[in-house]
Amino acid sequence: RFAWQHKLEPFDYWYAAEAASFSSLRDRAIAYGAFGGTPRYLAAIDSGSTLAENIQRLLLAKDGEVRALLETALDQEDGLRDTAKYRTILRAVAGGATERNEIANRSGLTNDRGLRDKLDTLIELGYLERRDNVDAQPNDAVRYAIADPALRFHQRFVEPNRSLLERQSAAQLWDAKVE
């Protein structure tokens, strides 16, 4: 029986930039900021389209392939229950809450062991990362951040503009909010 499991890590910037196949260094950097290093997201990029067209089609459009993958990622995690709370935590962190107390206040969740366990789970799954200062003391507050660039882009531009995306095209949102 095959029981070995290995978590596939996303590409770093160098390999993701090669996979994105844009010629300008600026476009490669922006592509990494929008799509991250997840090979599945990078594979959806159409090399015959501009960076703006790819972001609009894959991340901003209602039926965008990468957008759909990001929006359903938590639902596909084995053994993860009550995904609404995890989404609320991600939304709070993306909105600027970086410490556990801030996350609890912004998300409406209780700052207890349950929240800490959820934060640890999101770190283990690769959605969040823990950031400590170089000179942090053991009792200093831990800071959290969205770990994946594609999820960060989604939380920054798609989530807060859902109603706008229902009324306008992805190109209009791109022009008004992203570019």
What is each of the regions a protein language model found here?
Residues 17, 32, 102-105:
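The alpha-helix within a helix-turn-helix
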Residues 3-30:
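Conserved small helical "lid"/interfacial subdomain of P-loop NTPases
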Residues 1, 10, 38, 149:
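A short beta-strand-to-loop transition that corresponds to the Sensor-1 phosphate-sensing loop
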Residues 41, 45-179:
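Accessory nucleic acid-recognition modules appended to NTPase machines
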